[in-house]
Amino acid sequence: MIRRIAGAPGPVGSGSGGDRPGRRGTVRYLKDEAVPSAPRMLLGHALRSRRHHLGLKQEEVARRMGCSSSKLSRIESGMHHFKEKDLLRLFVVYEISGEKEQAVLLELAEIANQPTWWQEWSTVAQPYLQAVISFEDMATRIKAYSSDLLHGLAQTPAYAEALIRRGRGERDTHDALLGLRKERRARFEAAPGKKLIIVVHAAALLNRVGSPEIMADQMEHLAGLSERRNHQLRLVDPAHHYDLPVELGTTTIFDFEGRVPKVAYAENLDGCLFIQDEDLVDHREVVFDELRFKGLGPDAARRKLNDLARMYRKFQAP
């Protein structure tokens, strides 16, 4: 278990590797490029925040470290293998003397350097998907808003298969991705203390994936999830509320219970955003919570889902 990092991060300026400056972090737009795993990204973010808090330039730190600026840039971007000796030097340069904070950063580095359980799927899973899985692994609470398609952790195997089969790639690739999805779900369910909070727009329930039978089973599956202790489900139905901030778009917020700052993930057809700028993450969470509080409660949501399941059953061939 990773403990809390002592002290709040300072303001962060410009980075590298496609990062843009944020008020207190970075925003990465990603498509096909390599993506650091959660511990690498979080450790790099913590180090970069500390450097900017002290007002140090990369060139100055690199000189004091006896390394190149490009190496330091890769460390801060999470794209470099973390070595304990490098971290210990950075502790001196960045005046990180607290034992607890050092222990957190060293533990992040240790986790970052370990082989991942999804390594066997690395040739078929897109880099950003692997990063998402690493954040799911680390997060204690996951908040997900689904505006058009259901979140991967909420999908039935049949829904997931129909969705994956209509995507790019050969059948063997699809089979491998289905195996990854199954393992991903199993690990989430087996992990103690995790919670998934899902807000689903009504449109996502009407966007048909696969057959009417698949959709009916999916509606019943969602109704069942809403009764589990490690899940919370809310439905956003414009027919019941006006002026809903649905422009949030498909978004997932990873919460680490204060051990490290929250991270938001937003996706679209061509790429995705990993958002570490804490002001932007906070704003997305405020909007998410507004949707959650305005959404249908558990009982009303289950009634809606069961009604939709019956509707889809009527479309099935006799």
Where in the sequence are the language-model features?
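Interdomain hinge/linker segments and adjacent boundary elements that couple functional modules
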Residues: 2-3, 9-45, 53, 58-63, ...
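C-terminal regulatory/effector modules of DNA-binding transcriptional regulators
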Residues: 192, 211-318
